[in-house]
Amino acid sequence: MTDKRKDSSGKLLYCSFCGKSQHEVRKLIAGPSVYICDECVDLCNDIIREEIKEVAPHRERSALPTPHEIRSHLDDYVIGQEKAKKVLAVAVYNHYKRLRNGDTSNGVELGKSNILLIGPTGSGKTLLAETLARLLDVPFTMADATTLTEAGYVGEDVENIIQKLLQKCDYDVQKAQRGIVYIDEIDKISRKSDNPSITRDVSGEGVQQALLKLIEGTVAAVPPQGGRKHPQQEFLQVDTSKILFICGGAFAGLDKVIANRVETGSGIGFGATVKGKSQKATEGELLSQVEPEDLIKFGLIPEFIGRLPVVATLNELSEDALIQILKEPKNALTKQYQALFNLEGVELEFRDEALEAIAKKAMSRKTGARGLRSIVEAALLETMYDLPSMEEVEKVVIDESVIAGQSEPLLIYGKPEAQQASGE
């Protein structure tokens, strides 16, 4: 095609698509008996780009990663917790395989398998859920069970969880229905006693009842974007049977419930045996033997436990595991701070004894991996405050005494440019 302003007879030319004349546009491109202006070309490019954006996610979804691939990806970001990663990999693979096959296989209806993660604070429950969502490229949202109440009471309704998920994908219902919801602190909504409550328990058993249908699968009516400001708009209908719910909690004291059962010889299915005082199991070993009856005694109602058939237990992280977390994952904490210092043109070095001191401090605080950042941040605060105003600093070294608060980080200076040029 050629760029023409007038035809051979000198007539004024017009775009065949928008009808604008040659004087109203910058360029007019001619073809056999047809003309198109630069504005229409730009519009066509925009339409094509939008189409590509819509098609791309479908192409990405065509290849569902295998359990081995899911586990391998989790290994890149989460240290330890091997059993939990394997359980999650299989459960997530089966969930999305069920969605791809329309909930049925050869006429057999495939049930939904939501997941319950049990483990101490800072053991990696939230990180596992976030990493899974990132790998699968699906919308992800988190909810805190302690803020939820029954409908009609002050607090968050359970339907708000679905609204948050919709917000993460710009209110695209189809995308939201493939998402993952992580509900944290699920152990905090246990009822206060083994017996059904006589009075209203709006933040405990009542919330469990409210979550039942949502987790099992229902069509939730969610206000559209803008909510109450546009009451004339119809509610969005979201099918929660396609959403994967992962519930997590520390379940402090659950190990004692399990110990009481195991030590009386009532363990079922795990070959539990009576142990003497010298053979007391660790908390992690006890949690790995959890049974539905233990969760009922803890305060979860049987119907709620039934909606969470896949249970994965996480162990408390050891000192060695915390050191690995500091330096090995792709987004390890030390790598993050080194990248931050690199932006100032400065190298940051953590000596091995410093990493050990950070891990020891986190162990003493009993905050797990979650407490590592605050320890490193406190050690580097003064340096990060002063560094942008300092010149010629080439390297910052962190050793054990810095973590203990006994000394400042070691600053290594380079030669000034003038000295380097003169060879001094």
UniProtKB/Swiss-Prot annotation:
Coiled coil spans: none
Keywords from the UniProt entry: ATP-binding, Chaperone, Metal-binding, Nucleotide-binding, Zinc
Cellular component GO terms held in the UniProt record: HslUV protease complex
Gene3D superfamilies: 1.10.8.60, ClpX chaperone, C4-type zinc finger domain, P-loop containing nucleotide triphosphate hydrolases
Entry superkingdom: Bacteria
CDD domains for this protein: RecA-like_ClpX
GO function terms (MF aspect): ATP binding; ATP hydrolysis activity; ATP-dependent protein folding chaperone; protein dimerization activity; unfolded protein binding; zinc ion binding
UniProt domain ClpX-type ZB: residue ranges: 2-56
Binding site for ATP: 120-127
InterPro entries, sorted: AAA+_ATPase (IPR003593), ATP-dep_Clp_protease_ClpX (IPR050052), ATPase_AAA_core (IPR003959), Clp_ATPase_C (IPR019489), Clp_protease_ATP-bd_su_ClpX (IPR004487), ClpX_bact (IPR046425), P-loop_NTPase (IPR027417), Znf_CppX_C4 (IPR010603)
GO BP, one annotated term: proteolysis involved in protein catabolic process
Subunit relationships: Component of the ClpX-ClpP complex. Forms a hexameric ring that, in the presence of ATP, binds to fourteen ClpP subunits assembled into a disk-like structure with a central cavity, resembling the structure of eukaryotic proteasomes.
Annotated protein name in UniProt: ATP-dependent Clp protease ATP-binding subunit ClpX
Phylogenetic lineage: Bacteria, Pseudomonadati, Pseudomonadota, Gammaproteobacteria, Enterobacterales
Gene: clpX
